[in-house]
Amino acid sequence: MTENPFHYLVETLSGTSDKTFFNVSKLKATEYDSLPYCIRVVLEAVVRNCDGVLVKEQDAFNILNWKTKCEFKEIPFLPARVMLQDFTGIPAMVDFAAMRDAISKFGKDPKQVNPACPTDLIADHSLQLDFTKCIAAQNVSGLPAVETHRPTTTPGKTPGRKAQCRSQGGCKGACDLGAANGSSREQIENTPMLCPFHLQPIAEPETALKSLEIEFNRNKERLQFFKWCSKAFQNVAVIPPETGTVHQVNLEFLSRVVMEEKGCIYPDSVLGTDSHTTMVNGLGILGLGVGGIESEAAMLGVPITLTLPEVVGCELTGTINPIATSIDVVLSITKHLKQAGVAGTFVEFFGNGVSQLSVADRTTIANMCPEYGATVAFFPVDSVTLQHLKQTGVDLQCVKTFENYLKAVKLLRQENVQQPLYSKVLQINLNSIVPYVSGPKRPQDRISVMDMKKDFETCLKEKTGLKGFQIPEEKQNIMVPVTYGNSEYSLSHGCVVIAAVTSCTNNCNPSVMLTAGLLAKKAVEAGLTVKPYIKTSLSPGSGTVTYYLSASGVLPYLSKLGFDIIGYGCARCVGNTNPLPESIVTAIKEGELVACGVFSGNKHFEGNRCSCVCANYLASPPLVVAYALAGTVNIDLQTEPLGENAQGKKIFLQDIWPSREEVLEVEETLVIPSMFSELKLKIEKQNTRWNLLDAPESTLFPWDLRSTYIRSPPFFHKLEKIPPPIQPIERAYVLLYLGDSVTTDHMSPAGSIPRTSPAAKYLMQKNLVPREFNSYGARRGNDAVMTRGTFANMKLFNKLVGKTGPKTIHLPSGQTMDVFDAAELYQRSEIPLIIIAGKKYGLGNSRDWAAKGPFLLGVRVVIAESYEKIHKDHLVGMGIAPLQFLSGENAETLGLSGKEQYSLSLPVDLTPGHKVEIKTNTGKIFHVIAAFDNEAEVTLYKHGGILSYVARKYL
């Protein structure tokens, strides 16, 4: 291996004898001191990983000259670790398992095949709300202390006991708690509910346990594979369900701030397969949300490519308003940055206001980074960060080592040192921030709580659009009577029917959650209640939240108002929710009401919750509770009461809102090192379901040929020890002739599997019925399903066919058929395929199967006017050549019909930007550009893609 050209920067850390580091601050001190902190982290990674092949010496100097090279230079980046959630983790780990098989066939030790960096896989996105619970407690003052240990009863088999259901008579008699066990099949089929408010009447604390039991049963096959991965591979850790959301677990348990490998210490950084991986930016860790292929590349030791970004400095000044929560700060910053236009940039926070924000506040702000369009929202490590590490149980000597290292490489933010230079600077005065909500259709549409009533009434009148609902004037004050249980209610525009404290965005923040809990306590003590038809829930980011809500004594009060813990994964945050009561839905539809949902999550786009709830608002957890108490968003919380108690006394929000001092006192008492260490111990030792789950004890995975979820992919079937020379493509047919702005969702849809699709036909051949199809996203570990789903989007427009639909023409026969069926016929005849497209080919979310699928269909070349860069990189990563029409040319100007046959040759000495000649069987000749950006991409292409490139290293 080539010696690292920066080896002269290696030093021993002061105060230690066995810890070394690359002192990048000495590379070019003047230039280094002017770099933003987030760029310094990138520079350190390039210096440490410089091998002269995939990471070159010049890359480091390009970063040092960041201000002049910005947006013009691409640099390689290898993270300290990779984080996967279950949906994206499946295909990545399936590829690793298949690579082991391939290595074994060459007589090599398959145990060599392991991720090149620590990889954590968190199974959190499969949680669905199969159960919520009936409120058994009627007198909160008499409730016993809430236990944090697991019940000793068998999951799902609680002793039956009678208690009044919160539906107030909607059940057929009193709920027989725990009597009905249900099954995963019954829940999947969405059978009628025994109780209008619940899918099953079930007692707390069994609510979360019951949903988790079904989660394990529903996903048993995938979980068994994950468990095998955790045993078979080095550098792989699996965090099972029942733990928390991917980002909360990352923050509480996986983040290191400073990493160590073989005595070398370096900054923590992470690539995660979710846009909200940025949450750990609040802890001073560079976290980037990427797609499946980028994360898999990093796991394989191949760097991803970053364009040197603009870095926007966001200066926070002033002090936080006493009644404003961190969520108010988040929403204010979201709107400010959205308006300032920071899309695609790195945002770095500085100024005297930063020190007023706790790590929980910072991570909440960083979590919302994708909502204002930035790639990164970075808070450099400072004294607040170090104090947080001590508070959460990190060994004090480790914290001291971290501090010494970060000071040595100038990664510790201090007030008395030179400020970095930024591309531009924005200022936000924290004094000006007051409580806000966001909605009713987009997260960037922020409304002051004081203006909420006026704004909602305006939305009713405005034309249908970004905010308006265009309700006729004569219908704006309509009242719809509804019977729910044994009581009569009236619904009107603005009625709240869903109120959910959910998602990692808020649940990580003790002050915000404790404010909600203390507000609930004061509300109950004041005699307020929540109307029983409102679907309320509490979905904590992790068990940490349960711990401090329980220990503070507020959990019973939240439960009294209906905010019951229903599980620890992504539930209502990703739309996994059970339906509203039928009578409420009917009333909403009959009255054409603008019904509302209030959430403390990070997204609320239209249609993401319930179809009959057309106004959705993001709010802080205490405001979610407040609006649930009011029962409407059409209220002035300053001047109108939330409700009346049994004595007829009007109760206003200011009567029950806890002071910042109250919240701080509880937070300082509870957020202690033992809390985090206890939860870490629970994860490691006490997950009974995971511990009892059977998994193979083998180096190679024993593939089950009957499985419809996990299948060995064919990516290595033609693997040779030496990569064969680039072969000419002769007489290729066009599989698809596409236009502009073809998205990755057109290429590989992630939603439900249509009954008439090739994927459905395959699953039916496996004796599955439509209700068992699940989604393309859930079956990413089965290449047979995903290949059949490639270009199966109903909105695809193929010019060969001339109309919308997932069809193409098999040109030799002239027959119109499904894209997969045509590709299969071509492959049987060993005919290569190409795709012709227009501008911006590959728009949309990063999606691994948008490149893997075309490769398995037999596509070897894409010719487009322009590409979305990430997707183009994915094509290269799968061994598909991205070719680009010359400027001013496209298929139409060249007179191409798409029905020709195409022949071309890429030279052995292929270079980025090489001009390639293409001939058609009609005699037409034209030229295109080989759209490779650098020599590393050419190398990967010559190997047939990333997977083959890495596999050959083991041969």
UniProtKB/Swiss-Prot annotation:
NCBIfam families: aconitase_1, PRK09277.1, PRK12881.1
Protein name: Iron-responsive element-binding protein 2
InterPro entries noted in UniProt: AcnA_IRP_Swivel (IPR044137), Acnase/IPM_dHydase_lsu_aba_1/3 (IPR015931), Acoase/IPM_deHydtase_lsu_aba (IPR001030), Aconitase/3IPM_dehydase_swvl (IPR015928), Aconitase/IRP2 (IPR006249), Aconitase_4Fe-4S_BS (IPR018136), Aconitase_4Fe-4S_dom (IPR036008), AconitaseA/IPMdHydase_ssu_swvl (IPR000573)
Family named by the database record: Belongs to the aconitase/IPM isomerase family.
Domain of life: Eukaryota
Cell compartments where the protein resides: Cytoplasm
Keyword list, A-Z: 4Fe-4S, Cytoplasm, Iron, Iron-sulfur, Metal-binding, Phosphoprotein, RNA-binding, Ubl conjugation
Keyword Cytoplasm: yes
PANTHER family: ACONITASE/IRON-RESPONSIVE ELEMENT FAMILY MEMBER
Cofactor stoichiometry and binding remark: Binds 1 [4Fe-4S] cluster per subunit. [4Fe-4S]-binding affects RNA-binding activity, thereby inhibiting activity of the protein.
A Pfam short name: Aconitase
Requisite cofactors: [4Fe-4S] cluster
GO biological process: one example: intracellular iron ion homeostasis
Post-translational modification summary for this protein: Ubiquitinated and degraded by the proteasome in presence of high level of iron and oxygen.
Function as written in the Swiss-Prot or TrEMBL entry: RNA-binding protein that binds to iron-responsive elements (IRES), which are stem-loop structures found in the 5'-UTR of ferritin, and delta aminolevulinic acid synthase mRNAs, and in the 3'-UTR of transferrin receptor mRNA. Binding to the IRE element in ferritin results in the repression of its mRNA translation. Binding of the protein to the transferrin receptor mRNA inhibits the degradation of this otherwise rapidly degraded mRNA.
Main subcellular localisation: cytoplasm
Annotated Gene Ontology cellular component terms: cytosol
Signal peptide positions on this chain: none
Recorded name of the encoding gene: ireb2
Single GO MF descriptor: metal ion binding
Residues engaged in binding [4Fe-4S] cluster: 504, 570, 573
Originating organism: Xenopus laevis
SS bond list: none
